[in-house]
């Protein structure tokens, strides 16, 4: 194999390579076995024509196209490896020379991964993160957990307030015409939850059970049902019940009820403090990581990105998002129907920062190379086990989707992030 790479632009060039006689012979054998199955020749059973007879009747050249298709993928892959390039798209291949008894010569117009010139990526200044947990933080979390244990109690002859739950019938219309999804009976709605159209819940505040209320609202201009977007609607609402929250007492019994690992309210508060501390530390570490990696990306010099890389990133984000929906039991068709969106809408959404994500990935890969980062077999095994547990899959199933090289790449990128983040310096007034 002989391969030559000639750079033409920032991210593209021409790869010239040869297919030697041995490989050509292998390809011709494959091609002949394929075509002779369908040849009827007087004096021979179908599919049994000798090679010499075929060559005499049709010429060996008749096999060249099929032979090339048989050996080209391996030959191109070998040429790419020899030239040391990293293609990001399907090449445009041309045959330059294809003569009997000589090596075949081909050229491929190839788009390659941009060459990244790293700037500063260690010791970067990042804003100092707060990791302090206050008494107020603990009290707010305690109150949140208390709210979760609240019971709904019927409010007799009392006006509804924000935070109350009302049981209602409603029927909506636009210009006097009912619309799909605009009616329901005995619907429980928490006022102030903002789960209905803006303004709907506010107009029920102050009303009592057994009252009839006309609620007038305007659908948002970006409402998912286009036929309703921006239009005024009137809802006839009947309030059946008004229920208020009855909160449990904050005492030792409450603590033991919601957490079997504690015996008192003080123990619960201490446990909450430790949990909040861990959450705040994790959030601070993530903020440092995000800021430092973003700065490292800004400091790097990266040529204009090939569109193929941006498109691949958009499709990757799309598949990941839809995959997450599938895990929740929502297939793509159902998701598009529920949200009133299309695949193109999602692609436009992910296209917004696709360029930034690709550049970040390129910089992290460059750091892996600069730092000579490698993943051990033990780390690959641990990553495989972690992914299997995360997605509730057998390790063999994960391995069928992710090769060792892919796992090593992901581990290397994680280590590169650690190199950047661990060396970052927290500064109070960092920009």
Swiss-Prot record:
Q: What EC numbers are recorded for this enzyme? A: 5.2.1.8
Q: Tell me where in or outside the cell this protein is found.
A: Cytoplasm
What GO terms describe the biological role, i.e. biological process, of this protein? 'de novo' cotranslational protein folding; cell division; chaperone-mediated protein folding; protein transport; protein unfolding
Q: Which PROSITE patterns match?
A: FKBP_PPIASE
Query: Looking at the keywords, is Ribonucleoprotein present?
Result: no
Asked if the record carries the keyword Cytoplasm, the reply is: yes
GO MF term set: peptidyl-prolyl cis-trans isomerase activity; protein folding chaperone; ribosome binding
Q: Which NCBIfam families match?
A: tig
| Protein known as | Trigger factor
Instruction: Please report the organism this UniProt entry assigns to the protein.
Output: Latilactobacillus sakei subsp. sakei (strain 23K)
């Amino acid at each position: 194999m002989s391969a030559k790479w000639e750079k033409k632009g920032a991210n593209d060039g021409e790869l010239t390579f040869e297919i030697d006689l041995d490989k050509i012979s292998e390809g011709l054998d494959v091609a002949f076995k394929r075509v002779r199955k369908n040849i009827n020749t007087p004096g021979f059973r179908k599919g049994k024509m000798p090679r010499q007879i075929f060559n005499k009747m049709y010429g060996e050249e008749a096999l060249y196209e099929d032979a090339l298709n048989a050996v080209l993928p391996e030959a191109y892959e070998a040429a790419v490896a020899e030239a040391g390039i990293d293609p990001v798209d399907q090449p445009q291949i041309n045959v330059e020379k294809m003569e009997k008894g000589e090596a075949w010569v081909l050229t491929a117009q190839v788009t390659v991964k941009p060459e990244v010139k790293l700037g500063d990526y260690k010791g970067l200044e990042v804003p100092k993160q707060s990791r302090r947990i206050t008494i107020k933080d603990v009290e707010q979390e305690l109150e949140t957990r208390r709210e979760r244990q609240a019971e709904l109690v019927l409010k007799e002859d009392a006006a509804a307030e924000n935070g109350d739950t009302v049981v209602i019938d409603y029927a909506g219309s636009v210009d006097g015409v009912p619309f799909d999804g605009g009616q329901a009976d005995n619907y429980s709605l928490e006022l102030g939850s903002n789960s209905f159209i803006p303004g709907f819940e506010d107009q029920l505040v102050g009303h009592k059970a057994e009252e009839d209320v006309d609620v007038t609202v305007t659908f948002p201009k970006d409402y998912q049902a286009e036929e309703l977007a921006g239009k005024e609607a009137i809802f006839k609402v009947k309030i059946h019940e008004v229920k208020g929250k009855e909160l449990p007492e904050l005492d030792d019994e409450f603590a033991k009820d919601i957490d079997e690992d504690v015996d008192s309210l003080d123990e619960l508060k201490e446990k909450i403090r430790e949990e909040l501390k861990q959450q705040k530390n994790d959030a601070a570490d993530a903020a440092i990581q995000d800021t430092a990696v973003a700065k490292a990306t800004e400091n790097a010099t990266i040529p204009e990105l090939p569109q193929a890389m941006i498109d691949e990133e958009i499709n990757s984000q799309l598949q990941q998002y839809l995959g997450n929906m599938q895990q929740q039991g929502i297939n793509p068709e159902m998701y598009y129907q529920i949200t009133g969106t299309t695949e193109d809408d999602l692609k436009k959404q992910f296209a917004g920062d696709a360029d930034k994500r690709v550049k970040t990935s390129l910089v992290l890969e460059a750091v892996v190379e600069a730092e000579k980062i490698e993943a051990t077999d033990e780390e690959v095994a641990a990553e495989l086990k972690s992914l299997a547990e995360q997605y509730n899959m057998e390790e063999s199933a994960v391995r069928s989707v992710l090769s060792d090289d892919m796992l090593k790449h992901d581990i290397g990128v994680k280590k590169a992030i650690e190199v950047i983040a661990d060396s970052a310096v927290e500064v109070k007034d960092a920009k």
